[in-house]
Structure formats: structure tokens, C-alpha cells
Swiss-Prot record:
Binding residue positions for 1-deoxy-D-xylulose 5-phosphate: K125, S151, E152, S176, H199, S212, N217, K218, E221
Catalytic activity, reaction form: 2-C-methyl-D-erythritol 4-phosphate + NADP(+) = 1-deoxy-D-xylulose 5-phosphate + NADPH + H(+)
GO molecular function: 1-deoxy-D-xylulose-5-phosphate reductoisomerase activity; manganese ion binding; NADPH binding
Cofactor(s) the protein needs: Mg(2+); Mn(2+)
Name of the protein in its database record: 1-deoxy-D-xylulose 5-phosphate reductoisomerase
Residues reported to bind Mn(2+): D150, E152, E221
UniProt-listed HAMAP family: DXP_reductoisom
InterPro entries from the UniProt entry: DXP_reductoisomerase, DXP_reductoisomerase_C, DXP_reductoisomerase_N, DXPR_C, DXPR_C_sf, NAD(P)-bd_dom_sf
SUPFAM superfamilies the UniProt entry points to: 1-deoxy-D-xylulose-5-phosphate reductoisomerase, C-terminal domain, Glyceraldehyde-3-phosphate dehydrogenase-like, C-terminal domain, NAD(P)-binding Rossmann-fold domains
UniProt key word Ribosomal protein: no
One Pfam family of this chain: DXP_redisom_C
């Protein structure tokens, strides 16, 4: 039995992780969970899964959940704030921590978990984007597995099994193209939030849905792949694959290309990461190749979807630049979701911040947190 801690248990990935745990009660146990404001959802989780600990980052939600547990004689301990997240991520009895919180808030508890020798099922790609070198170093020193919880990196991970790193020629990172695939820049001038949230293939949260529409999600995944698999940026190629059946491919020096195919369902990479290195019975719809009939591939349009190009540039510059890219994107997406800016202003704000805040300083956790803070203050003051 594996004891699971989910950071971000009420979001899209967290909810699908609970579905996997529900299917595998004999193998997986929800030991701890965190959420922000979703007190009603956490209460439902407490009633069904009976975790030993939950943590809420919102004070009002914390008090509501705590009151519920006291009134109903629940044995779940309720914690509060980032300190609560750090605590549940490093509990002795936790075997693996699934980090599915959105954004920079995942950095500190992920590091706490690694330093307490917990394997990480990583759905919070921002953590690796902003602190890739730090995370890699800490994971190596503490002999911790970083298991990717997304379809693309989970696919690459599997395509690399049994092969030598030195034999890799190229990683082909697939992208659906998002809801605006094939459109030109001028067609995106008046895109609405509602249109941008309608992803053709995947069921995701709001922030990642907007990132998928701008192709920033793929850009962040390029940086993530660089750190996860120690592959140069020149050897990571994004391939637009609208069907989302091939989740990524690895090309080897002898010309062989190994691909991982499956129905587009996040429960598969979640299940694989939680049970690694064992494969369990299928929790997703079986892939029927005869129904698919054809698979198509295109080059990404970097002029229309500038965020992908910006991500490559930030990754190659390195240092603090991926932090600047990520933070400016987070705040720009927040403005777009709140209808304060247009869709095409997202890459403009990111590029502006990459120029304004560029520094040759090396990474540290403190510098990353400070950079995120000053970028947030700058963007909110200028654009609100």
C-alpha cells in the first residue's frame, strides 16, 4: 500500500488522481491533501477517503473545514497555510507526493518533500521551470525519483526506458495545437476567455488551458524536458499533432523513433507515476487504432504563437530567465482571465518583462521568490 499526498487535491489533476485512487483502493491510500479555498470539495474528500491530514491555504476555508471535522468527530487533522502544505509534503508515512498546485506556490513544498526523501509525481511544471537546477541537484542528493505527471513527459520517460542517454538524437514533444491551431495572428485579436478555455482534446484547469491556447504550456514543457531528461534545447522539437494520440517520441542515433500512444486521458500518466515501476490494470478507455484512421503532424507557427519562441529563448539563456518567463506569464494569464487584457497582450507582457528584469544572477530559492514578487507587483500596477 502506497500512502499518497496530493498538493492541489481539488483541481483538475487532483480530482483525476482521486479517481485513480478510487479505482485502486487495494494499492493506493490518500494520506494527506491540500487545497486553497475549495472547502466543500475537501469536506467531500474527507468523508470519502478519510485522509489523516488536510491543509487549506485560505483562512476562511481552513476554519470551515476544521469546524466540520470537530463537529463530525473526524480523525483528520486540519492544517493551515504554506506551512501546512510543507508539513503534509514531508510526513514520515507519505510515500509519494503528487504536486498539482498551479504556479510558483508548489516550489517550497516540493523542495520540502524532496529533502525528506519523498518521491515526487510532478504535475506542477512551473516548479521545474523556475528551479530546474535546484530541483535536479536536491533530487540527486536525496536519491528521489521525479516522475512526470503529464502525457508528454510521461511518454518520453517510457520511451527512454532500457536505452542509453548517449544514444538519444532528438526528443519530439507533441502538441495538440490548442483551440486556435491553424489561425493567424490577426484572427486572434478579439479572442474571448471562453473561446481560449475550450481545449479540443483535454480536460484541464483554467490556467493550463490558456497556456495551451498560447502554446506557452508547450514552451514550459520544453524547459521541463530539458531538465528532466538532460537534453539540449536544440534537440527538443515541438511537433503539432492534433489527434493527441502520440504523446511524444524519442529519436535515437540509429534512426529509430520510439513513440508512446494512448487515448488522451490524464489518468494514465497519473496512474503510471503513482505505481511506478509497476503497471496496473487500465483506468482509461482502450485505444482503437482502426477508429483513428490517420495521424497528422505539423510544424508550430512561432510567429502567431510567440510564447513558444519566448520559452525557447528563456530556456537557452538560463539562470533567472525561466523564472521571469514563468512569473510574467502567470500574472499575464491572470489578467486575461479577469478580462483586463487581450489574448495577444500575453506574449507582449512576457517579452517586456524578459527585457526589463533580465539579470545574470545565478538561481537560488530566495531570488526566485523575490523575482516572482517584483514581477507580480510591476504587472499588476501597470495593467490593472
Amino acid at each position: 500500500m502506497k500512502n499518497i499526498c496530493i498538493l492541489g487535491a481539488t483541481g483538475s489533476i487532483g480530482t483525476q488522481t482521486l479517481e485513480v485512487i478510487r479505482e485502486e483502493k487495494e494499492n493506493l491510500k490518500l494520506y494527506a491533501a491540500s487545497a486553497n479555498k475549495s472547502s466543500e470539495k475537501i469536506i467531500s474528500i474527507i468523508e470519502e477517503f478519510e485522509p489523516k491530514y488536510v491543509s487549506m491555504t485560505d483562512k476562511e476555508a481552513f476554519l470551515k473545514v476544521k469546524e466540520f471535522c470537530m463537529k463530525n468527530n473526524k480523525n483528520t487533522e486540519v492544517l493551515y497555510g504554506i506551512e501546512g502544505m510543507n508539513t503534509i509534503a514531508s510526513l514520515d508515512k507519505v510515500d509519494i507526493v503528487l504536486t498539482s498546485v498551479v504556479g510558483m506556490i508548489g516550489l517550497e513544498p516540493t523542495l520540502k518533500a524532496i529533502r525528506n526523501k519523498k518521491d515526487i509525481a510532478l504535475a506542477n511544471k512551473e516548479t521545474l521551470v523556475v528551479a530546474g537546477e535546484i530541483i535536479k541537484k536536491e533530487a540527486h542528493e536525496n536519491k528521489v525519483n521525479i516522475l512526470p505527471v503529464d502525457s508528454e513527459h510521461g511518454a518520453i520517460f517510457q520511451c527512454l526506458l532500457g536505452n542509453l542517454k548517449g544514444d538519444i538524437n532528438k526528443i519530439h514533444l507533441t502538441a495538440s495545437g490548442g483551440p486556435f491551431r491553424g489561425k493567424k495572428r490577426e484572427e486572434l485579436e478579439n479572442v474571448t476567455v471562453e473561446q481560449a478555455l475550450k481545449h479540443p482534446n483535454w480536460n484541464m484547469g483554467k490556467k493550463i488551458s490558456i497556456d495551451s491556447a498560447t502554446l506557452m504550456n508547450k514552451g514550459l514543457e520544453v524547459i521541463e524536458a530539458h531538465f528532466l531528461f538532460d537534453v539540449d534545447y536544440e534537440d527538443i522539437e515541438v511537433v503539432v499533432h492534433p489527434e493527441s494520440i502520440i504523446h511524444s517520441m524519442v529519436e535515437y542515433k540509429d534512426g529509430s523513433v520510439i513513440a508512446q500512444l494512448a487515448s488522451p486521458d490524464m489518468k494514465l500518466p497519473i496512474q503510471y507515476a503513482l505505481n511506478y515501476p509497476i503497471r496496473k490494470d487500465r483506468v482509461i478507455e482502450k485505444l482503437n487504432l482502426f477508429e483513428i484512421e490517420k495521424l497528422t503532424f505539423y510544424k508550430p507557427d512561432l510567429k502567431t504563437f510567440k510564447c513558444l519562441d519566448l520559452a525557447y529563448r528563456a530556456g537557452k539563456i538560463g539562470g533567472m530567465m525561466p523564472t521571469i518567463l514563468n512569473s510574467s506569464n502567470e500574472y499575464a494569464v491572470e489578467l486575461f482571465l479577469n478580462k483586463k487584457i487581450g489574448f495577444l497582450e500575453i506574449p507582449k507582457i512576457i517579452e517586456e518583462c524578459m527585457k526589463k528584469f533580465y539579470t545574470k544572477e545565478e538561481q537560488s530559492v530566495e531570488k526566485i521568490i523575490h523575482m516572482d514578487k517584483i514581477i507580480g507587483e510591476y504587472i499588476r500596477e501597470k495593467y490593472n
